[in-house]
Structures are given as structure tokens and as C-alpha cells.
Curated annotation (Swiss-Prot):
Protein name according to UniProt: Short neurotoxin 1
Major site of localization recorded for this protein: secreted
Family: Belongs to the three-finger toxin family. Short-chain subfamily. Type I alpha-neurotoxin sub-subfamily.
InterPro entries: Snake_3FTx, Snake_toxin-like_sf, Snake_toxin_con_site, Toxin_cobra-type
Lineage, broadest ranks: Eukaryota, Metazoa, Chordata, Craniata, Vertebrata
UniProt key word Transcription: no
MF-aspect GO terms: acetylcholine receptor inhibitor activity; ion channel regulator activity; toxin activity
One Pfam family this sequence matches: Toxin_cobra-type
Length: 81
């Protein structure tokens, strides 16, 4: 009986994914879409211009940026594409 109860608890934890993680896009500029699993609860998309043109950086979290860099932070899976 104890074994059955323990098995049910383990299955419940695995199915509920109590350690919820976020999936964020992490490709740079116009590269093909790639994603990563993050421990943070948000994703970001940084955009700026330099001599190469418009540069886009994507990743996990919501970093501080320097003036002149556009930052968009969001809180749903793959929201920074």
C-alpha cells in the first residue's frame, strides 16, 4: 500500500511539473528560430543598430540595458520571437 501511494505521489509531481520552467527564443538577429529552457520567469528581446545594421538578441530574463537599446520583456513561452 505504501509503495502504491509513493508511486502515485511521484507520478503526480512529474505530471504537474511543479518546477515550472519558461521556454524562450534565443536565436540572434535573423538566424533560424531556436529555443532554450530557462529558470527565469521572463524572456527578452534586445534591438539596436550599429555599422552591421539592426541587431537582435533574445534570451532569458529581463536584463538592464544601456541607453539607445530597445528592450522588450515578456512572460509567456516563446513570446520574444
Amino acid at each position: 500500500m505504501k509503495t502504491l501511494l509513493l508511486t502515485l505521489v511521484v507520478v503526480t509531481i512529474v505530471c504537474l511539473d511543479l518546477g515550472y520552467t519558461m521556454t524562450c527564443c534565443n536565436q540572434q538577429s535573423s538566424q533560424p528560430k531556436t529555443t532554450t529552457t530557462c529558470a527565469e520567469s521572463s524572456c527578452y528581446k534586445k534591438t539596436w543598430r550599429d555599422h552591421r545594421g539592426t541587431i537582435i538578441e533574445r534570451g532569458c530574463g529581463c536584463p538592464n540595458v544601456k541607453p539607445g537599446i530597445q528592450l522588450v520583456c515578456c512572460e509567456t513561452n516563446e513570446c520574444n520571437n
